[in-house]
């Protein structure tokens, strides 16, 4: 999420607000000879997981992010992450696809949340009322339905054109809230609506990935019990007024316990 959009959250009181794979193509076996490139936004760069590399600057790439964990455990022949906090589908096309080549054999990408305005939605839902929150999510869902299939197709076509032989794994987003628990902060209606919006984006992304012949790695199931408002160990940051950038992003445990095993399975 973009830091500028989250900055308004500092006006709010800090409150606790509270795997399965869809296969377009069967994942091949991981190989030490793989040449792996990671694309995407803050969920791929590892915002919220700490241990950011100095070279990544404002992109905030973490050594605890799922692409870095894959590199550390599988040891592909080469690895490069160009995932960047705040990235949109346009940013992937304009600034990240150049990292791919005909020798790339594995690509991961998590993208779309900034296109539909994750950060703006959470700002609205925290700072305003239930009706404004629901309206913000409805507007984002309209963008998801009308704009995201085409935007995602453009990204996926760009990946295939630049890396024609690569296995491509499209990794989705976790649903933020566990429902039906006692939880302060947002209303139950707002939490359910936010979940509805995330589910829609994931479903649209899965369809687009499958149509492109890519593998969709769905992290929603594995995060159940670790969401905001759950009684288990949280794998997502709630609102953090001392470090707004990490709000609603996976923790290091969320990357290692949630994202990494799902991606590892999908990658082969």
Identify the role of each PLM range.
Residues 1-30:
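Secretory targeting and sorting signals
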Residues 174-268:
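Catalytic His-Asp segment of secreted/periplasmic serine-dependent ester chemistry enzymes
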